[in-house]
UniProtKB/Swiss-Prot annotation:
Its cofactor is FAD. GO terms for molecular function: glycerol-3-phosphate dehydrogenase (quinone) activity. One of its GO terms (biological process) is glycerol catabolic process. The lineage of its organism: Bacteria, Bacillati, Bacillota, Bacilli, Bacillales. This is Aerobic glycerol-3-phosphate dehydrogenase. Gene3D superfamilies: Alpha-glycerophosphate oxidase, cap domain, D-Amino Acid Oxidase, subunit A, domain 2, FAD/NAD(P)-binding domain. It is found in: Cytoplasm. It is an enzyme of class 1 (oxidoreductase). InterPro entries: DAO_C (IPR031656), DAO_C_sf (IPR038299), FAD-dep_OxRdtase (IPR006076), FAD/NAD-bd_sf (IPR036188), G3P_DH_FAD-dep (IPR000447).
Length: 555
């Protein structure tokens, strides 16, 4: 049953095997850009390996606004080309993984004296529809003030003139990343998490490999490759320093936080994109019985590994909520969870964080190290295509075979083999029935079918196999089934991997995490044969994340 190529129980073997081959491409960084590049390259026939020093998607790729969006706000900066490319790309991302990405109608209210008026909103959304190639059923409509309040009664009534209504796509960024990575594994890619590149290896001034440290065991491995890509997001400049090539352009990190509230406190029924008092734009989005709101955009110069919410960040978002939804009187005590993430933007002199372009660029150093900088979640597939085209051309120049064009445009990602978006609901309905037949509640069966898509049978098989063990441990069987699946087929190596990135529960169901964490940690501890010290360390790490999700940095 185990997928040997992507089980965290196989990490040692995988790392040892890597030292015995020379790869066409070695990718440093296991976020969405690295995962997309691995899938593109492996599906063209390249031999690909990848290392990620934390967990997959642990950096920016699990901390976004969780929208595959068309970039409406970039029209304000007249970034027409970006809106056109990203908008079209959005539909492709959706079709290839409809279980992780879903259309979400967005309300854009406009008030007297706000950033957008009726005319600019209408024109802006029309241009957006045109540039982004929006399909007919999802084209924007304009609403009166009365219609706007029917869509969302909580919106500020004072000065309300109307609203725009258009489609965004909501996603689970971390699961999108892991599903892309799993599809890359199917094509033969070899990704390993918790493996840090300590240094680059050179021959005659050219980068020919990496020295990797397994962060969990402290063992070291030398791995060789014809081409090396730096897809480390916020860390790209650190790797360029190792390569002595950090000159010219560099990154500017900005931080964005999101707050999560229970629907009982913030009963939003409709996603809203709205003005803040200082002229920025913020999203409020209902999701799984919660409402989440963000984001901020502030220059960040602290440690990159664990950005935290500050009191100032928190208060800014709360003030924005109470400005647009004045009847709620939200306070800091209402916050159930939060997250903070970094945008790895390409520095532009004299620009405010919100004005800096989100475009991506590829830089090649004298040693041949290829760096991908900037970019957006939505554009990951296109970015990967550009990188792999460059790698293909360089390899061809050096006498290697031609690996041909990109194949990912109509390629479902792992879990996405459900017959396209039009068949998703019938697929989920059928699988929900199977889950109920296996003894699960309708709610749990449906949630599993949506989360795992066409891989859900692998989870259902484990529901059958783990019934006795679940009863013995006094934990619902589907939780053990998910945990085992994520260890054996999604390279989950720590409790945080499972609770934060494989299930998103630390953000969207934090009390569930508090309820089941000890039982899941016990289960994982036996699977990984952790000693007491290791088990305590993993427990402490998870408890710290639970604390940081609610308590700002200064408290």
């Amino acid at each position: 049953m185990m997928n040997h190529q992507f089980s965290s129980l196989e990490r040692d073997r995988m790392l040892t095997d890597m030292t015995k081959k020379t790869y066409d491409l070695f990718i440093i960084g296991g976020g969405i850009t690295g995962a997309g590049t691995a899938l593109d390259a492996a599906s063209r026939g390249m031999k690909v390996a990848l290392s990620e020093m934390q967990d997959f998607a642990a950096g920016t790729s699990s901390r976004s606004t969780k929208l595959v969006h068309g970039g409406l706000r970039y029209l304000k900066q007249f970034e027409v080309k970006m809106v056109a490319e990203v908008g079209k790309e959005r539909a492709i991302v959706y079709e290839n993984g409809p279980h992780v990405t879903t259309p979400e109608w967005m309300l854009l209210p406009f008030h007297k004296g706000g950033t957008f008026g009726s005319f600019t909103t209408s024109i802006g959304l029309r241009v957006y529809d045109f540039l982004a190639g929006v399909k007919k059923s999802e084209r924007r409509s304009m609403l009166s003030a009365k219609e706007t309040l029917q869509k969302e009664p909580l919106v500020k009534k004072d000065g309300l003139k109307g609203g725009g209504y258009y489609v965004e796509y909501r996603t689970d960024d971390a699961r999108l990343t892991i599903e892309v990575m799993k599809e890359a594994v199917k094509f033969g890619a070899e990704p390993v998490n918790y493996s840090k590149v300590k240094e680059l290896l050179y021959e005659k001034g050219k980068a020919v490999g990496v020295l990797i440290e397994d962060v969990l065991t402290k063992k070291e491995y030398k791995v060789y490759a014809k081409k090396i890509v730096n897809a480390t997001g916020p860390w790209v400049d650190q790797l360029r320093e190792k390569d002595h090539s950090k000159n010219g352009k560099h990154l500017q990190h900005t931080k964005g936080i999101h707050l999560v509230f229970d629907q009982s406190v913030f009963p939003l029924k409709q996603a809203v994109y709205f003005d803040t008092p200082d002229g920025r734009m913020v999203f409020a989005i209902p999701r799984e019985g919660k409402t989440y709101v963000g984001t901020t955009d502030t220059v960040y110069k602290e440690a990159l590994e664990h950005p935290r919410m500050t009191t100032e960040d928190r208060d800014y978002v709360i003030k924005s909520i109470n400005y647009m939804f004045p009847e709620l009187n939200i306070t800091a005590n209402d916050i159930e969870s939060s997250w903070a993430g970094l945008r790895p933007l390409i520095h532009e002199e004299g620009k405010d964080p919100s004005e800096i372009s989100r475009k991506d660029e590829i830089w090649t150093s004298d040693s041949g190290l290829i760096t991908i900088a900037g970019g957006k979640l939505t554009g990951y597939r296109k970015m990967a295509e550009h990188i792999v085209d460059l790698v293909r051309d360089r390899l061809k120049e050096e006498g290697e075979k031609d690996f041909g064009p990109c194949k990912t445009k109509n390629m479902p990602i792992s879990g996405g083999h459900v017959g396209g978006s039009k068949n998703l609901m019938s697929f989920v309905t059928a699988k929900t029935k199977e889950g109920i037949a296996a003894g699960l509640s309708e709610k749990d069966a449906k949630q599993l079918a949506i989360r795992y898509g066409s891989n859900v049978d692998r989870v259902f098989d484990r529901v059958e196999a783990l019934k006795d063990e679940a009863a013995k441990r006094n934990i619902p069987v589907h939780i053990l089934a998910e945990a085992e699946y994520s260890i054996e087929e999604e390279m989950t190596a720590t409790p945080a991997d499972f609770f934060v990135r494989r299930t998103g529960r630390l953000f969207f169901d934090i009390n569930w995490v508090r309820t089941y964490k000890d039982a899941v940690i016990d289960f994982m501890s036996e699977r990984f044969q952790w000693d007491e010290q290791a088990k305590n360390k993993h427990t402490e790490n998870l408890n710290k994340l639970l604390h940081d999700a609610v308590v700002p940095l200064e408290q």
